[in-house]
From Swiss-Prot:
This is tRNA-cytidine(32) 2-sulfurtransferase. [4Fe-4S] cluster binds at residues 123, 126, 214. Its cofactor is Mg(2+); [4Fe-4S] cluster. It is found in: Cytoplasm. The keyword Nucleotide-binding applies.
Amino acid sequence: MTAQTQELTKAQQYNFNKLQKRIRRNTGQAIADFNMIEDGDRIMVCLSGGKDSFTMLDILMSLQKSAPISFELVAVNLDQKQPGFPEHVLPEYLDSLGVEYKIVEEDTYSIVQDKVPEGKTTCALCSRLRRGILYRTAKELGATKIALGHHRDDILETLFLNMFYGGKMKGMPPKLVSDNGEHVVIRPLAYCREKDIIKYSDMRGYPIIPCNLCGSQPNLQRQAVKQMLNDWDKRFPGRIETMFRAMQNVVPSHLADFSLFDFKSIDKNSGVINGGDIGFDKEEIAPQVVEDEDLVMEFDPSLQLNVTNI
C-alpha cells in the first residue's frame, strides 16, 4: 500500500466516523425528544431495501448496543412481487447481520397494475396497501412500535406539498398513532439530513434495491418539491436547517388559524402576545448561524483518527 493510498484510507475512516457519529447523535436526539423508544419495546423496522431504511436499521442496531434501556429489533420487508425483484438480497444481508427478520410476501404489484390506469401515479394505492399489510404484520410479531425511515428532507417536502397542493400547514410527524389506531409509528431519522444518509449509505455499501413502482415515475409533485429544496440548499446554505427549525418554533398567535388561537377575544387590554408585532414596518429577522458540517476531503495528519462512536 502506497503512502498516498494509506492517507486516503485514513481520511475515509475519519469521514466515516464523523458522519456515523452525526447520524447517531441526530437519531438519538430525535428518539429522546419524542420519546420514540422505551424500555421493553419491540421495534418493527420497516426495511424497503433503500438507503434510508438500511441506514435506520444500521443506526438502531448500533444504538441498541449502548442504550441505557433494553429494546428488541425485528426487520420486516414486504416483497410485493415486482418483476425482477431480487428475493435473495435482503435475507442474505440480514442473515449476515444476525438480526431477527421476516419477509412478508404479498402480490400488491398486480393489484396496483390492475387498479391504476397506465400513466397515472401508483404511489397512493401502493402506500395504502403497504400500510395495511405492515400493520397486520406488526400485530402478528407483537411489535410495540413501527419504525419508518423518513428523514428531515421528507418531512420538509411533505410540509411544502401540503401548502402548495393541499392548503394546509401540515408536515410528517416524527411520532404518531397508526391509521387503524392500534400502533405507534416512529421516524427515528427525523433529524437526519438526506445528503448525510446518501454519503453514509455509499460508504457502507448497502445492497440497495430500487423501487420500480413509485420512485422511477416522472413528474411527481414530490420530485418537483425535492428539486426545489435541493436547489435552495445549494444556493442558500442553511435555509433547509432554518426551515426545519421553524417547524419546531410555531407561533399560533402570529398565523391565521382561529382554531389554534382565540383572535376574537383580543382587545387592547389583552397585552402584548408572543412579542407583539410591528404594525407598519416589516419585521427584521436576524440571520441564523448554521454550522458547517461538511466532511474533510483530504487527509490532514493532525486529525485524530481514534474517533469514538457514541
